[in-house]
A protein has these predicted regions:
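Acidic (Asp/Glu-rich) sequence patches and key acidic residues
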Residues: 1-113
Length: 113
């Protein structure tokens, strides 16, 4: 499958910024990069894809987010839609820039059936 373009990679960052600005996750504000890790782990888990993890140094389990530079276009659409779903569920007011990216992802998916 075709690898995502730089433009597609840039599409997700305004959405991640909206999450970072508006969502407090278990009492903590997260960075855009931390949200990217959480969202990509979610996407992999919901698609039953292999999710890289390792035992934590002090116990527990650490899941590694996906580096999207080698991701497919379809995967990037899945990430954008997951951000939108999660944000909407948490009452995030998406910016105009984010709304345009969400519309692009929905149009892309609709054109692929």
């Amino acid at each position: 499958e075709e690898t995502r373009t730089d433009k597609q990679n840039r599409l997700m960052w305004p959405l991640l910024k909206d999450l970072s600005d508006q969502v407090v996750w278990h009492g903590e504000k997260l960075t855009r990069e931390e949200w990217k890790d959480l969202i990509t782990v979610l996407v992999n888990q919901t698609q039953d894809q292999e999710q890289k993890s390792a035992p934590g140094i002090n116990g527990g389990r650490v899941y590694f987010g996906v580096r999207t530079s080698k991701s497919s276009k379809r995967y990037m659409v899945d990430v954008i839609e997951a951000i939108y779903w999660f944000g909407t569920d948490r009452g995030v007011k998406f910016s105009e820039a984010s709304s345009k990216r969400i519309a692009w992802a929905q149009e892309w998916r609709a054109s692929r059936g």
